[in-house]
């Protein structure tokens, strides 16, 4: 029985994502939370892309 508990804990540790490591920006709300701006096409000069805003053509950009 102890082995089952140990295996369950190990699987939970492996399968659950670490909150700090995965900062996936895929919609406009998460873009705004990360102090970004949604822009169609490419990001403006002096800005870097940090994700997308729902569609691949709309980029989430943030000042460098």
Curated annotation (Swiss-Prot):
Keyword Membrane in annotation: yes
S-S pairs: 31-60, 38-53, 43-61
SUPFAM superfamilies per record: Defensin-like
SMART domains on file: DEFSN
Keywords assigned by UniProt, alphabetized: Antibiotic, Antimicrobial, Defensin, Disulfide bond, Membrane, Secreted, Signal
Location of the protein in the cell: Secreted; Membrane
MF terms (GO), sorted A to Z: CCR6 chemokine receptor binding; chemoattractant activity; identical protein binding
InterPro entries recorded: Beta/alpha-defensin_C, Defensin_beta-like
Signal peptide as annotated in the record: 1-20
Cell cycle found in the keyword field: no
Propeptide cleavage-removed residue intervals: 21-23
Any GO BP annotation: positive regulation of flagellated sperm motility involved in capacitation
Function: Has bactericidal activity. May act as a ligand for C-C chemokine receptor CCR6. Positively regulates the sperm motility and bactericidal activity in a CCR6-dependent manner. Binds to CCR6 and triggers Ca2+ mobilization in the sperm which is important for its motility.
Family: Belongs to the beta-defensin family.
Subunit comment: Monomer. Homodimer.
Record protein name field: Beta-defensin 1
Organism: Sus scrofa
Gene name tied to this protein: DEFB1
């Amino acid at each position: 029985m102890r082995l089952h508990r140990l295996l369950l804990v190990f699987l939970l540790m492996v399968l659950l994502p670490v909150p700090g490591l995965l900062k996936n920006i895929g919609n406009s709300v998460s873009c705004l939370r990360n102090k970004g701006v949604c822009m169609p096409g490419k990001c403006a000069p002096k800005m870097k892309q940090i994700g997308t805003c729902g569609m691949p053509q709309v980029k989430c950009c943030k000042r460098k």
